[in-house]
């Protein structure tokens, strides 16, 4: 086809008219060094603290050090193929993770990507991992309980919704077991759970996921994994990712429980990053802001007011408070609670459950030391029936420990002392509990009633466990409606007291155990 000169000029004019000049400003820089997951970048002028920097190969780094002539960033993922001279680019975005109900029942990594082989996740949106905690006015006091199902915890160190309760102890003292049982006990309570595994073996995490599935608790739990094989950056960020997922429920007037297992390993990961970034080390080589590392995380666990929820949901949810309860775990070395990270977290939290290796090794499990375990705000949230009946437990144990130490040196003891020692031994025996067998409020109330009103006085020490099992079986079979109602209401009055008395009287009179 032949075109004459006029047609050609018309075509060129038409193309020129259609041409648009698109100016796209990109903030790019160049990698000048790569070492141990830390990259130094030259040429990024408008980068924010914590901003995501796009790397070659669909990967990201997070800007942590903003210096005069370079930026120190930590790589999220493998870094072995990164080299000097590679070009990187600012994204203008802070790290966000997917949030929503679609994450329940799933196992995800720090960035919210599924790692359980169950396909894609339908999330409800994204949330920044770093959020400022609710202010004083937006909060509400803690007055609703979180039942762990453990007699020793719910009676002596009760936990409320919106509280931060530290679980602290040496390795192999049952810290994770206590937290996992607390999650299992929420399967029918409506509390959504998030379990954040930091620096653990993949086999250990797989075992936890399997146990949650076996006990029907995985369907309302999100498992966030930053295993020992992951980079220090992902281990450092995992708790913040899990917290953002929990805040989704809190801000919509629901209740959530988050377990950080454990924050000692997160602090070590952060120390590694800080030293590689050449930040000045302080006590135990931790950086100066290691307190802020944990305080800004744990302050996000709170109970928020109806007004806060209504404002956040733009009026969709009215008259509901939301809560995020945190159970951070800290591992101590040879029972040293005065080390840097343990003292920091103790001062941030609203109480601690101290697990002792001596108690654990002598068969007292959960190995809760009632002398130094406290709950600073949970007392107001304790159910009425447990609060009323558990009053004498801590006193009995304190007196028993004092007398037991004294009795080692005394040859003959008077009747009153012998009675107190026997009572203390029986209370200690009764507070023992197997893993994966949480008790309901009514079951705990019945057992505590038996202690409080002397029903164990004629029971031999080695028969306490058998007595308890038979009593609970009898009550759940013959008084099922009463037990269900007591668990639901948690009230305590003369009528309930008389019914509990009747249950125990009839059990002791008619049942052989």
From Swiss-Prot:
Entry superkingdom: Bacteria
GO cellular component, one term: proton-transporting ATP synthase complex
Source organism of the structure: Histophilus somni (strain 2336) (Haemophilus somnus)
Enzyme Commission number: 7.1.2.2
Function statement: Produces ATP from ADP in the presence of a proton gradient across the membrane. The alpha chain is a regulatory subunit.
Cell compartment(s), UniProt: Cell inner membrane
Gene3D superfamilies: 2.40.30.20, ATP synthase alpha/beta chain, C-terminal domain, P-loop containing nucleotide triphosphate hydrolases
Keywords: ATP synthesis, ATP-binding, Cell inner membrane, Cell membrane, CF(1), Hydrogen ion transport, Ion transport, Membrane, Nucleotide-binding, Translocase, Transport
NCBIfam families associated with the record: atpA, PRK13343.1
CDD domains: ATP-synt_F1_alpha_C (cd18113), ATP-synt_F1_alpha_N (cd18116), F1-ATPase_alpha_CD (cd01132)
Record bears the keyword S-adenosyl-L-methionine: no
HAMAP family per record: ATP_synth_alpha_bact
Bilayer disposition of the protein: Peripheral membrane protein
GO molecular function: ADP binding; ATP binding; proton-transporting ATP synthase activity, rotational mechanism
Designated name of the protein: ATP synthase subunit alpha
InterPro entries per the UniProt record, alphabetical: ATP_synth_asu-like_sf (IPR023366), ATP_synth_asu_C (IPR000793), ATP_synth_asu_C_sf (IPR038376), ATP_synth_F1_a_nt-bd_dom (IPR033732), ATP_synth_F1_asu (IPR005294), ATPase_a/bsu_AS (IPR020003), ATPase_F1/V1/A1_a/bsu_N (IPR004100), ATPase_F1/V1/A1_a/bsu_N_sf (IPR036121)
